[in-house]
Structures are given as structure tokens and as C-alpha cells.
UniProtKB/Swiss-Prot annotation:
Organism (species): Xenopus laevis (African clawed frog)
Main localization (coarse): nucleus
Biased composition (Basic residues): 28-38, 155-174
Region of interest (Disordered), residue spans: 1-70, 149-174
Name of protein: RNA-binding protein 8A-A
Compartment(s) of residence: Nucleus; Nucleus speckle; Cytoplasm
GO CC terms, sorted: cytoplasm; exon-exon junction complex; nuclear speck; nucleus; U2-type catalytic step 1 spliceosome
Cross-referenced SMART domains: RRM (SM00360)
Amino acid composition bias (Basic and acidic residues), ranges on this chain: 1-11, 44-54
Alphabetized PROSITE patterns for the sequence: RRM
């Protein structure tokens, strides 16, 4: 069995303790900024978050209207034939203006289209003309539905208040 050598008994000054080291660690910890949670922004005004303003078209009435995405005006086309190609959609929608981007999702299992497409225009006028001109029209023998990809929500000033249901007979008696 091996002998165990105790360093303190052997008079080993090899491992001298730095007593000043503890003070420097405490000083560093005092200067360090305490951070908690996601983003470390608890005290730096996270409640006053800056909202980006996107272009939207003013409309009369309570209906939500179209809203511009970061890149452009996007149309959501549904009812697209599963064997349609990007060229077919480009030919049909290209009549109304310059197409900035077309996105088609394919089904991984079959390799065919999932039945919808996203068509992006630079200007509102081109997108509106395409939507009005092609909504309900046939594309490869199938009628397509064209609508805005992004819409504004309902107006914030007009909210319902109070009860939405009638009171039960038991509650009316009280």
C-alpha cells in the first residue's frame, strides 16, 4: 500500500495561498452587472418595444385591409392544380405586372404541389390588378382563389364589451 504524503506536514511551500486573490474576486463580482432571463433586458426598457410600421392601404369600414410585407405585396393563391409549374403561374400572373417572387410548396411524399402558391409584387397596384383579374379564373382547368397574403387586423377602437350570451334563467331571478 502506498504512503500518502501530506503536503502541510512535509513543509511544502510549493502551494502558497494568495490571500489578496479573494479581494480581487469580490471586486470583480461587485462590478459585474447582474443579468436575468431571456435577453437580459429586464431594466433596459423592454416594455417600450419599437414596432415596425409597414405600408398598408387605408379602407373605409370595419373590414381588415391588405398589408405590405417586408419585401412587397404578397398574394395567396389557393386551388392551384397539383401539376402546375412555376412557369404556368408566372405566365398567368405576369400579365398584371412584374413578379418579384413566386413560392410553391411541394408535397415531399408525392412531389406535387400542395395546392397553393405565394406570388409577390413590388407595387400595390400590380397586386390588386392580379387579384381582381384572376380571382375565380381557371388555371390548368381548375378555378383559383386569390387573396392577400397579409391583412391588417380589425380596428382596435371598436371592441365588444359586456356579456355575449344571455343570462341563464336562474341568474335572472336574483
Amino acid at each position: 500500500m502506498a504512503d500518502v504524503l501530506d503536503l502541510h506536514e512535509a513543509g511544502g511551500e510549493d502551494f502558497a495561498m494568495d490571500e489578496d486573490g479573494d479581494d480581487s474576486i469580490h471586486k470583480l463580482k461587485e462590478k459585474a452587472k447582474k443579468r436575468k432571463g431571456r435577453g437580459f433586458g429586464a431594466d433596459e426598457g423592454t416594455k417600450t418595444r419599437i414596432r415596425e410600421v409597414y405600408d398598408s392601404v387605408e379602407q373605409d369600414g370595419d373590414e381588415p385591409g391588405p398589408q405590405r410585407s417586408v419585401e412587397g405585396w404578397i398574394l395567396f393563391v389557393t386551388g392551384v392544380h397539383e401539376e402546375a409549374t412555376e412557369e404556368d403561374i408566372h405566365d398567368k400572373f405576369g400579365e398584371f405586372g412584374e413578379i418579384k417572387n413566386i413560392h410553391l410548396n411541394l408535397d415531399r411524399r408525392t412531389g406535387f404541389l400542395k395546392g397553393y402558391a405565394l406570388v409577390e409584387y413590388e407595387t400595390y397596384k400590380e397586386a390588386l390588378a392580379a387579384m381582381e383579374g384572376l380571382n375565380g379564373q381557371d388555371l390548368m382547368g381548375q378555378p383559383v382563389s386569390v387573396d392577400w397574403g397579409f391583412v391588417r387586423g380589425p380596428p382596435k377602437g371598436k371592441r365588444r364589451s359586456g356579456r355575449r350570451r344571455s343570462r341563464s334563467p336562474e341568474r335572472r331571478r336574483r
